[in-house]
């Protein structure tokens, strides 16, 4: 009996790779089952624009205080997503008229519930370096509205996790800015008339909740 078991044990032992290489090691870390971010209300019909990566692989997408949202369109090149909620009242679409490309901007979003209680929006400052935002805002600001010092729409915030070895969330995110004209072009291409008049970003952002399997 020992002679038949021993080769099997040896074969299994030699097949074990404690530190995998290649595609097995290079795969992205698993996404959170529930992830929170921010969306910008862009039209009174319930249209909301956000970061496409935030809602990637979601089984259900919900807008806090309003209910479930439909995924209407995506732009994988710019990582933008268009959502829509129905029957919502009291929406305040943001004025998306662009600013003059200031290097210091305000990011208005709704932080992850682990960082704050409630759905209140908050604003943090960041500097624009090319397409990068420094420093990166807190988790939950993916999809946040970026406004320049004149109160003009500067673009949409994206958070991209750094893929390195180590515990989940051990490293800070990288933040990027999708410029205002790219956001407007995306909406126009999807027949959304962005005629918002609100200049108060805090009144025009909503919490986006993504639920994955």
Residue ranges and their predicted role:
Residues 27-51, 65-70, 92, 119, ...:
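A conserved glycine-rich beta-strand in the N-terminal activation segment of trypsin-fold
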Residues 35-37, 44, 59, 65-67, ...:
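Envelope-exposed proteins and targeting segments
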Residues 86-145, 156-171:
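Flexible, gly/ser-rich surface segments that form the specificity/activation loops bordering the active-site cleft
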Residues 2-10, 101, 137-141, 148, ...:
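Soluble non-cytosolic domains of exported or imported proteins
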Residues 33, 41-42, 74-76, 99-101, ...:
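Extracellular/periplasmic catalytic domains that process cell-envelope and extracellular macromolecules
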Residues 4-36, 87-93, 153-213:
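C-terminal cap/linker of serine protease catalytic domains
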Residues 39, 46, 50, 81-83, ...:
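Terminal peptide-recognition signature
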